[in-house]
Amino acid sequence: MYIKDKYNMTKNENIFLAKRNIIGSIYNSVKLEGLDITFPETYAIYYKARLEAVNVADVNTVLNLKHAWKYVLCNIDKPITLEYILDVHNEVAKDEAIAWGVLRNGGVGISGTDYRPPIPTKEEVIKKLKEFERISGCTERSVERMLWMMKKQLFWDGNKRTAMLIANKDMISHGKGIITIPEKDIELFGELLSKFYSYDEKDDLKAFIFEKGIDGIVFDKEISHEEPVLE
């Protein structure tokens, strides 16, 4: 299945959308990881409020995502290289994983499936990233790279979060929207992702992402308007 582009915005319009929805994107990401946290708590943590009832590790996860999003938006025009991905993971998994900002160097398992991803090598990852750049459609390229990163498990932890941020970097820089899995659809996404891990079947997963997981704005180009002013 080939995913066509769902939205066509300018880069500045897409950055405006990403900034406006950043807390929602972070909330969906932490719920995807199974964290017991509410949207108001996520909002409060983002704005550095002190919360006694929230686990310290959960607070760290939210703040790491805040910093990772800041890195992506501040470096939106950089090419997606292994070094770029390592920098994003360094923000995502800081003080959470065995190591962060480096490729995994040991074996891991994935809950819910018998699939065991092989240990990644630098040469293999660089080669694969170059192959993705040959895909002309931005949404197709972003989703394919994201799913590959999730299944490959490049890191000890934070793989889904990092993969989705890299996908969003590509999507935003080309004005194609934002990928985020709404809380109400996380269970189905998990089932389809497990099926992909186990059997390498991804058509249903890609169709789901297109229908439920890509957000954007359709602008009336007939109306004259200025580019959104970025903070």
Q: Where on the chain are the PLM-derived regions?
A:
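FIC/Doc superfamily catalytic core
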Residues: 1-231
